Amino acid sequence: MESWLFLLLIALIAFVAKNQSLLIASVVVLALKALPNSAKIMSWLSDKGINLGVTIISITILVPIATGQIGLKDLIQSFKTPMGWLGILCGILVAVLSSKGVGLINQSPEITVALVFGTILGVVFLKGIAAGPIIASGMMYVIITTFQAFQH
């Protein structure tokens, strides 16, 4: 019963905060929880959900390449500017940090609770987004802003 109330509370907070992604996620999890054999579905999502999410984000990132909005010349151009190099470095850093983070979660599963709670707080109250590659652009923003502040 506690999990139902917790999920409903998250859905309510998401609704009040007008966070559509978290609202949809909590309603979907509530709906899945109501299904017979939900333990199997939840177990599968728990095991494969991050990979599924990363796959969907990767597809989204590749769409501009497929539509021709981004081409090989754009990739080459990214190596010619400091912003391009910074973007590449931030992407590498996020990939490495993510792999270390997954290792930490596997070693200390109790960290997951704090991460989930922190993510919910960030998404709801700070208008954040629970997404991995987006973090790279956020890190890039911080680095660029810091760099620009020291230039003036």
UniProtKB/Swiss-Prot annotation:
Keywords from the UniProt entry: Cell membrane, Membrane, Transmembrane, Transmembrane helix
A Pfam family it matches: DUF441
Chain ranges passing through the membrane: 4-24, 52-72, 85-105, 115-135
GO CC, alphabetical: plasma membrane
Localization in the cell: Cell membrane
Superkingdom to which the source organism belongs: Bacteria
Recorded topology in the membrane: Multi-pass membrane protein
Coiled-coil features, chain-numbered ranges: none
Main location: membrane
Record-stated family: Belongs to the UPF0756 family.
PANTHER family: UPF0756 MEMBRANE PROTEIN YEAL
Name recorded for this polypeptide: UPF0756 membrane protein EF_1246
The organism of origin for this protein: Enterococcus faecalis (strain ATCC 700802 / V583)
